[in-house]
């Protein structure tokens, strides 16, 4: 696949992976599902779910290091700024041969356009929060998050390559 194909797939993921409702219990259940999926894949990642700026779920798996929390924060900031997945923003920048700082004036100290953060979209409303993971290569982070989210919502979506 090329970047254009991946961006189309990402747009479909963002449009399809929407919630009819989202609350504290949803965050707990989804965070637990992500933890289980990471354990099955033998990954050491950190998982964060925020709703309207409030952290509802956070878990750092054994084997993670403190800097992973900063990666989670920086990826989350990208989703909060653009209401798009961090991986999609990274691919768009790659396609334009640009960076967050060059194009938008966003410092790499606070923003990271690497895969692993995804908007929580509420049907009829839009982005109300973020789901962020970090600890694996960016495509692996993105695909784990999206496949778990799709399963959680009872949907089937192809992975991005």
Curated annotation (Swiss-Prot):
<dbReference type="InterPro" id="IPR038084">
    <property type="entry name" value="PduO/GlcC-like_sf"/>
</dbReference>
<protein>
    <recommendedName>
        <fullName>UPF0303 protein Spro_1996</fullName>
    </recommendedName>
</protein>
<comment type="similarity">
    <text>Belongs to the UPF0303 family.</text>
</comment>
<dbReference type="InterPro" id="IPR005624">
    <property type="entry name" value="PduO/GlcC-like"/>
</dbReference>
<dbReference type="InterPro" id="IPR010371">
    <property type="entry name" value="YBR137W-like"/>
</dbReference>
<dbReference type="Pfam" id="PF03928">
    <property type="entry name" value="HbpS-like"/>
</dbReference>
